[in-house]
């Protein structure tokens, strides 16, 4: 009746009493339907809340349930944002009543179900206006997981899952529109729902169905980075890992837990997830479920899940704090990695057979990768040795004939082969004795011989390790050389001797020629890397061994020369030319210097000229190594003449180039000089700006001071050594400025000794007070250093004055020369004017003729000759005074 209906508003009741009556039955029915709709539309939520809060609510159970049904009916299309806070309050009141009255379970679940529908808004701004209230309301859903009802908990999880359903309701109340698709998800993030659900896992630990629903909800929530961070606060990773080996015939427990772990790894800090998984309990759980899937998982899905867990295990292996070895997981994985190659029965994998499916192929690659990770853990090295990892990996260092692997395709075998050889480069240096006992050097050299052979082979080049190897054997060559590089770089005498005894130097030179010829056809990063690695191997093998340098000499120098002649433009190509050039220079230093036969051949090939050409490019990163090589080469008496003979652009000499480099170095160091390059600071003429700022820092006796360290940190010491070898007298091609700088270079060692004494004095005065005689001696030493500075400054001034005087003399000579040129030009001009006058002016011509006649008459003899012929001085037809040729 209307009196018992708390859902009706006063306005509706008055309209029913005073409204206009209809005249026929159909109008009355329509009116009754409208009234019922109005009743539903005008549910008084505050009244219902008061009704549920009534202390005598036990007697009002039917009334309360009826009111709740009206609420459910009223909001069957979705909850308006403005009413959401009251609905959640009703939910909480229902949850409280459930403890004593089970009848409230169903309406509570129905109300929770409504929360899964899209919320409704009247205005666009409602989403922002109600955001705080909505986020708190959604958070309350998570808190309702405390209600001890399986039905309620499952419904909450279903509600959360429905947040990700973008399907819109079929009908909406007039004036309302659904909120945006991601609104609920954003509010769930804001309210921290994910963290609450993770904590609720403790409540459903023994209820499999509820647990699976919570995991399903978390699986959806974990697609967001914000939710993943909230979950990590609740230790989600460790909680989920412990569920991995729980009893679940459906397999959903492992699947959903591992899926959430993956999302956590992708969306949060990998280190934080790994740290949470690094407890002994978690590692043991991971090991158990992995072993179970390995031995009993035959479905495609099981193998994929097994591989996912293997990736997580690899991440754990990267963490030194994870008890992988203590749990026995590491040993299981190593045994599994070498199972098909070593074929030694092991109880850990008894009865296991690989099917050569794609998932097993992926697992094999993951296991190889894991060995690479374990090689970085010193504690795992013993396990790698005991389980024959080196022999297993060496099974792949053979020509591509698929020995014993009849079920892998050619492309798969090649990928495994390259991966295994790449991992061998990481493991071999740790197990050198095992490496040598397996004749690994021999296998690698034979394999490299096959790589440059003419056998028909088409590399697939499909994998990461196969880059650049399509249609050739370059990928195999690249990784085999990496293995050799990794063991040779140990500088272990046994390894290097074993290689050289098998003719490695000659074979490496052949491979280098092969790669260099290939590089002429098409340069790429792989070929450049191969060449650089071979040059490094030769450097390491030949260093400090004259006999090996002699084996290298002629053929090696011929190969090195083109590298030093490299086009400078290629150094910045980004392909690796710069690294290749450095490797070539290092090889020159290690394989040529110290062997006179090789040195002389290098000089004969004009190698010194090439080095100076490189130095003249002024590539700062090349200075140290080139200058070092030149200094070492100067021990050969023929070298200095080659250096002195060299000429660069604009006829630049080597001495001028070296002095220019000195000035450039001092400019970068901030050494104080005046505008003419003269010394300014007599006490510390070599000190740069940074050295002066540092001052004198007391250091232990076994630590070099700044003045000593500075020698190796810049090129001035090498430039000084080289100029000492050339001699400071009669250096060609130097200007006055060069001589000013040369005066400093010549006294570099004196200044450096003075710097060391200066540091020594400063350190002594900080802790001791020298006695009179010692103080006097220190004072004399300091004065000697300053006197040297003043002497050099005076010499520099003398050079500059001499240059100035010479310039004045040159200027005077030039001026005199210019005067002579002007005078000569005036005479030529005057002569030309006379010539023009004589040839162009008629009066002048007549005058010239008269003068000519007078001159002729005057020259005649006064005595008349009898019977003599008289010749006329006039020539008929003469019309010019110059020859016809002009």
What are the functions of these language-model segments?
Residues 1-288, 295-307, 314-365, 373-395, ...:
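Elongated alpha-helical scaffolds that mediate protein-protein interactions in large eukaryotic proteins
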Residues 34, 74-77, 427, 437, ...:
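Alpha-solenoid helical-repeat scaffold
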Residues 308-311, 365-369, 418-422, 479-485, ...:
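Well-ordered alpha-helical segments within folded domains of soluble proteins
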Residues 338, 449, 513, 565, ...:
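Extended cytosolic coiled-coil "rod" domains of large eukaryotic scaffolding/tethering proteins
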């Amino acid at each position: 009746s209307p009196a018992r209906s708390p859902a009706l508003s006063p306005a509706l009741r008055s309209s029913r009493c005073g409204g206009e009556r209809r005249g026929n039955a159909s109008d009355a029915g329509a009116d009754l339907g409208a009234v019922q709709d109005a009743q539903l539309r005008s549910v008084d939520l505050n009244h219902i809340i008061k009704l549920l809060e009534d202390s005598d609510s036990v007697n009002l159970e039917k009334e309360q349930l009826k009111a709740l049904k009206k609420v459910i009916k009223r909001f069957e299309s979705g909850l308006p944002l403005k009413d959401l806070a009251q609905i959640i309050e009703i939910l909480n009141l229902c949850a409280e009543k459930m403890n004593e009255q089970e009848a409230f379970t169903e309406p509570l679940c129905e109300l929770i179900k409504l929360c899964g529908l899209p919320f409704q808004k009247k205005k666009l701004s409602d989403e922002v206006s109600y955001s705080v209230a909505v986020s708190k309301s959604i958070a309350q859903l998570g808190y309702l997981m405390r209600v001890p009802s399986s039905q309620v908990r499952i419904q909450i999880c279903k509600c959360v899952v429905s947040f990700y359903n973008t399907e819109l309701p079929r009908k909406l109340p007039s004036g309302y529109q659904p909120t945006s698709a991601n609104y609920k998800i954003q509010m769930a993030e804001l309210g921290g729902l994910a963290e609450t659900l993770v904590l609720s896992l403790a409540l459903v630990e023994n209820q499999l169905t509820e647990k699976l629903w919570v995991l399903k909800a978390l699986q959806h929530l974990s697609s967001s980075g914000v939710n993943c961070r909230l979950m990590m606060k609740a230790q989600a990773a460790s909680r989920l890992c412990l569920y991995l080996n729980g009893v679940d015939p459906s397999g959903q427990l492992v699947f959903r837990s591992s899926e959430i772990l993956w999302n956590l790894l992708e969306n949060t800090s990998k280190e934080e997830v790994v740290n949470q998984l690094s407890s002994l309990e978690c590692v043991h759980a991971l090991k158990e479920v992995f072993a179970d899937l390995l031995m009993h998982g035959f479905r495609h899905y099981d193998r994929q899940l097994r591989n996912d867990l293997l990736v997580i295990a690899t991440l754990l292996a990267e963490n030194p704090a994870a008890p992988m070895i203590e749990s026995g997981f590491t040993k299981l994985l190593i045994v599994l990695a070498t199972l098909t190659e070593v074929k030694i029965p092991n109880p850990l994998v008894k009865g296991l057979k690989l099917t050569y499916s794609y998932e097993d192929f992926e697992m094999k690659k993951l296991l190889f990768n894991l060995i690479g990770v374990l090689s970085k853990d010193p504690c795992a090295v013993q396990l790698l040795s005991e389980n024959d990892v080196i022999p297993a990996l060496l099974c792949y260092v053979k020509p591509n004939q698929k020995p014993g692997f009849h079920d892998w395709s050619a492309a798969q075998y090649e990928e495994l082969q390259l991966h295994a050889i790449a991992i061998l480069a990481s493991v071999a240096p740790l197990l050198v004795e095992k490496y040598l006992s397996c004749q690994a050097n021999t296998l690698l050299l034979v394999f490299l011989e096959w790589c440059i052979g003419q056998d028909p082979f088409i590399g697939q080049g499909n994998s990461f390790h196969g880059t650049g190897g399509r249609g050739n054997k370059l990928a195999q060559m690249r990784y085999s050389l990496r293995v050799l590089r990794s063991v040779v770089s140990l500088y272990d005498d046994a390894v290097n001797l074993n290689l050289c005894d098998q003719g490695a130097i000659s074979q490496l030179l052949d491979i280098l020629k092969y790669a260099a010829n290939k590089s002429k056809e098409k340069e790429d990063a792989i070929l450049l890397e191969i060449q650089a690695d071979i040059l490094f191997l030769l450097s390491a093998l030949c260093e400090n061994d004259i006999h090996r340098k002699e084996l290298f000499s002629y053929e090696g120098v011929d190969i090195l020369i083109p590298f030093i002649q490299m086009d400078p433009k290629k150094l910045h190509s980004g392909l690796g030319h710069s690294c290749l050039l450095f490797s070539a220079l290092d090889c020159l230093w290690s394989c040529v210097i110290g062997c006179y036969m090789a040195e002389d051949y290098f000089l004969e090939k004009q190698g010194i000229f090439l080095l100076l050409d490189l130095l003249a490019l002024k590539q700062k990163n090349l200075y140290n190594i080139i200058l070092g090589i030149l200094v070492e080469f100067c021990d050969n008496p023929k070298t200095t003449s080659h250096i002195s003979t060299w000429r660069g652009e604009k006829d630049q000499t080597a001495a001028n180039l070296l002095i220019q480099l000195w000035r450039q170095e001092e400019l970068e160091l901030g050494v104080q000089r005046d505008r003419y390059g003269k010394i300014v600071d007599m006490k510390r003429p070599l000190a740069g700006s940074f050295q002066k700022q540092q001052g004198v820092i007391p250091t232990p006796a076994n630590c070099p001071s700044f003045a000593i360290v500075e020698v190796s940190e810049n090129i001035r010491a090498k430039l000084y050594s080289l100029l000492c070898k050339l001699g400071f007298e009669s250096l060609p091609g130097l200007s006055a400025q060069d001589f000013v700088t040369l005066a400093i270079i010549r006294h570099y060692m004196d200044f450096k000794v003075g710097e060391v004494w200066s540091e020594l004095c400063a350190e002594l005065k900080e802790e001791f007070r020298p006695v009179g005689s010692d103080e006097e001696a220190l004072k004399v030493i300091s004065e000697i250093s300053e006197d040297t500075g003043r002497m050099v400054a005076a010499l520099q001034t003398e050079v500059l004055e001499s240059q100035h005087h010479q310039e004045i003399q040159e200027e005077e000579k030039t001026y005199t020369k210019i005067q002579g040129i002007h005078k000569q030009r005036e005479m030529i001009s005057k002569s030309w004017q006379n010539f023009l006058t004589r040839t162009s002016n008629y009066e002048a011509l007549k005058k010239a003729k008269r003068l000519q006649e007078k001159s002729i008459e005057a020259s005649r003899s006064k005595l008349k000759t009898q019977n003599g012929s008289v010749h006329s001085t006039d020539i008929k037809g003469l019309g010019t005074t110059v020859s016809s040729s002009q």
